[in-house]
């Protein structure tokens, strides 16, 4: 049974695809109970009588992460669970209240989406040959009621152009005739509600869903890794996969293969997997695994950290280890990178909420993360020669990155802050151990960030081997012919701003305009052009010889600047708020959007061009006609300074 | 056992007090009262405590617990068996858990029958007001005296007085 989509509506609907590509709906009656534990059931006997009479409550025992509990199974919904909480003055412990029922059904049945061989869930070799259709809409969804220019690619490419109502009606016709299993559509989640309003008004049937039904996800703004993100409301069709190619992080990073892999692991429909963050995916994966193993999932996160002495807390809560680099240019440098360091630590050191008190028990987190870690090792290796594994590898990388942060997340079902701290404590020990080891073997340690170490010296293969032996973790090596560690404003080395030439002839760049999404195109492409020239230099001697050529790129860009197309100067920002107490360019941009009738929400991305920086005057990208030349010249100069440092800094050679 | 916040303002065992005060007043009250070392002290704060890095208490009787959800806060209060329970208010805990304001307030009141319970915030907000409704006393100390040393440093850096007014020019500019 190859499941393409899953929905819970008075039972579970599985949309299954057969070998011929026909998709049909299978309905299963399913009404799982949630579980209730009371410290003193006799104190709530009246409530239990009602639950027994009206909600089929029955005494039972069930397994939590920390062991077996006696309690009751109750057939009811979340609302009932919340009433029980109120009634018991929040003494009740509830489980399996908010697990997605379609996911729970599949976990219990041992099936998963996008695959039909039960043994292949952790395999990177699965079919992605779905009938797909790409819909590229040229219009701006924030400013136009209906699209007027659309390119549709199925078996062939068609362009639809004309009045909105005609284009949308034609698009509906194409979806119906091609009948794709997967639709990849730009800004799908913004367009679909508009299409629905149009279809209701004109009496048309919107053909994205196979049975005319849509699930609704509401819009929200949320904090993720220190920045505000915004998710549009979404209409999700039944029986067909619809991916918003602009908004889906998983699709952007991992492509369709990444979305399908996320769905296979998490047990969520690809429609949901495409719309969730890696953090939600890893948590869904843990929930699927818990249900599969017969462990109930807590409804509320009520178990707080244990009481600690202040000194213990200060010692434990210190995060990752850093070694600050000395800014400069270095030749023959090796970057040793621990593959999936934090998840590997969880697995190797058996770190899980329940093993903190009972270290000899086999931990839930290590058990469920181990197959993902080994799958990541495999895809990381295979993508070097087979690019089709790159999307899956990236998805796994993100899921594993977030699995660590998730242990400390306040609402993590299977997280606990002490586990988070134990992981970082181990990582600090490992990085220090590795540094000491490298230095004892005659290497010079230049820089270190959490799970990476930059060293000069040889033989690096022996060092790698020794690191593996001592730490039990695998360290990958990338060799730089030369690398530039940039300075901070105060002259000390920046942790995360560097670039260099790898021995395969490519450049690795971090933290400068060429890699920053917020930098204007004109500056990003200027720096990329410079780096392409620098990439031809195999050592610092050759690098010095391309200086004039690189400088010419800068001077030419400066000269062209006054005549540049304003759209190439757009600055992208993800806004964290919509009200600003101080005057700033970002605040002016938010106001400019509003003046043009575009509603903004925290987490949304905006693009603006600076018309007059001193007066805080900016224009949205679509309105810009002029720009502040001196302001952009200063941005260009900053970008040049990052590059020019490679020609002026001190060269450090090994030994 | 009591904590002296200001002359004439003391907090005693067997009460639940809601206190609004400048941070330096509270840290001074916690750091400069050696008698507190003799009692079991539980300091409760969220993920972004403004006080904890300024507390110089190292006694083994001084313990910290950090709830990151309102449900965890309720558990922490219910499990506390300390003589002094000090809660640094974190409004973010209640952003999606307003349902717990009343039970948490009641748990603080209940704990205040046996212990000295302090709910502290530097300024009033809606969750604090809801929790403080069940307090025996609401104490607000307004910063009229000497400024917080940290505030003073920030003012010096920004070229303003600690009260926010611009500093007068003290040297002549040389062209």
Where are these regions (language model features)?
Chain B
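N-terminal regions of ATP-driven nucleic-acid and macromolecular assemblies
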Residues: 1-175
